Amino acid sequence: MNLFTDFEARINRILESIDVIREKRSELDFRRINVEPPRDASHGDVATNAAMVLAKPLGMNPRALADLIGDKLAQDPEVAEVSVAGPGFINVRLSVSYWQKLLAVITRAGVDYGRSALGAGRKINVEYVSANPTGPMHVGHCRGAVVGDALANLLAFSGFDVTKEYYINDAGSQIEVLARSAFLRYRQALGEDIGEIPAGLYPGDYLVPAGEALADEYGTSLRIMPEDKWMPLVKERVIDAMMAMIREDLAALNVNHDVFFSERALHDNGAARIRTAINDLTFKGHVYKGMLPPPKGQLPEDWEDREQTLFRSTEVGDDIDRPLIKSDGSYTYFAADVAYFKDKFDRGFDEMIYVLGADHGGYVKRLEALARAISGGSAKLTVLLCQLVKLYRNGEPVKMSKRSGDFVTLREVVDEVGRDPVRFMMLYRKSSEPLDFDFAKVTEQSKDNPVFYVQYAHARCRSVFRQAAEAFPDLDLSSIDLAGAAGAIADPTEMQLVAKLAEYPRVVEAAAFSHEPHRIAFYLYDLAAVFHGHWNKGKENPALRFVNDKNRELSIARLGLVHAVASVLKSGLSITGTSAPDEMR
């Protein structure tokens, strides 16, 4: 039950009952009517701009229309008070009985409270991480991994049919560099002194096990082969080794994908899929042969001063047309992007989300143009860009580069502070904003550490049930009807907690609609703050404590409230991919 959806329906029924509105309904735009929390909580629990939206087309004074709507709202037995503010905002304060009824709904729903059918089963593909398989995951990959995974969880909770996908970039020139680097480690494993790693190769020690595995499998046979013979063998083995390492790194972060899509598959059979995708664009009139003028500034690697096969992307929203086939007949990197998007579209996805690093900002328009051209506008494409994460160690930023071998791995960060702090803190800023990761801050046991503060609220909730078991040893907490006891909840501070719980479905819906999972983390912190505040009031005033061994009925009712808080905390933490501990010491 979404409080705001519920009152939107009630207000719509009232509007339909007003003759002048009913008579002019076809001329009115009800979509602009909002039902939301008031900006100032002291004004009430629900606010609507209905009178301000409808007054002008009806030729009425907004305040007069607000008074008319407000008078009808005030007749609702679950409305305690209605007031009109400013030019015509209608503020509604709900009755205690409404909050009690809503608490019963939340308690019965448990961790499913806030789950919705917003997606209506629509198929959505979320592609994230997609790091080159050239080494272990570093902390720079971490944010996109967490944002993508949490977004996928959020969309699934909101009724979408979600596929989590990883695109393996295993067909580019970097793979040849990787293979040569692994071959060098193979020679080292055979006892050869390789000296310093040559410039341009990957120097990291993470390739030592790959070289040893090649030596175990092939002995000395690779060393006597020409490069064109050993290269495909080494490529295959080292890509498998790197992807196994990446999967382990992601598992340490509780990130799991449904599909791992290999770029090499697009190049199989003479690049048949790429050729088919370009033919499809050609049939739709989006491909031509021509020359592009040299762009201002630095020349992109796919620009040539000769005729190429081009995607007419400027006609579908891009800044410039994009090369697909070079003058020598080879495909550009973007041609593989075309084939990959077409593959997703052919798999029946209604929407594709790409979670990319901020350095991929230049790809946004070309991908959006590609989506319009291939789908004819029927498929939606969204690109989320994740800004950089800065790590500080001894006051100095840590350089991260696979090529130099000097980088902090994702696994090192997780091993040092734990999975939960990493996941939650990666969501505690909007993904489009830079994030500083403070090793000391994320392990503090204080309200200044959001993940501790939220998890501690859940642990406190569970401790209340242990206290109740001690206070009422004959009480079977597994069988009592906590929802049925909600009618005993009446204290204003308890109503404040129920009101905060009531916001959750709206927060989930807004976060899913805007593709912003950080909203869940922000909400959880706010809910934890209200709960901790109520807990502290109970320390000062015994009458407000959740468990009162002198009042069994009230204690059971308050257990229902605590159960509701714990359920929403656990639900939100699950979306973020963070655990909800029963105890914290």
UniProtKB/Swiss-Prot annotation:
Subcellular location: Cytoplasm
Matching Pfam families: Arg_tRNA_synt_N (PF03485), DALR_1 (PF05746), tRNA-synt_1d (PF00750)
InterPro entries named in the record: aa-tRNA-synth_I_CS (IPR001412), Arg-tRNA-ligase (IPR001278), Arg-tRNA-synth_N (IPR005148), Arg-tRNA-synth_N_sf (IPR036695), ArgRS_core (IPR035684), DALR_anticod-bd (IPR008909), Rossmann-like_a/b/a_fold (IPR014729), tRNAsynth_Ia_anticodon-bd (IPR009080)
Biological process, per Gene Ontology: arginyl-tRNA aminoacylation
Keyword line: Aminoacyl-tRNA synthetase, ATP-binding, Cytoplasm, Ligase, Nucleotide-binding, Protein biosynthesis
Motif ('HIGH' region): 131-141
Keyword Transcription regulation attributed: no
Keyword Ribonucleoprotein among UniProt keywords: no
One term under GO cellular component: cytoplasm
Record-listed E.C. numbers: 6.1.1.19
One of the record's GO molecular function terms: arginine-tRNA ligase activity
Reactions catalysed according to its record: tRNA(Arg) + L-arginine + ATP = L-arginyl-tRNA(Arg) + AMP + diphosphate
NCBIfam families found in the cross-reference section: argS (TIGR00456)
Similarity-based family: Belongs to the class-I aminoacyl-tRNA synthetase family.
Subunit: Monomer.
Name of the featured protein: Arginine--tRNA ligase
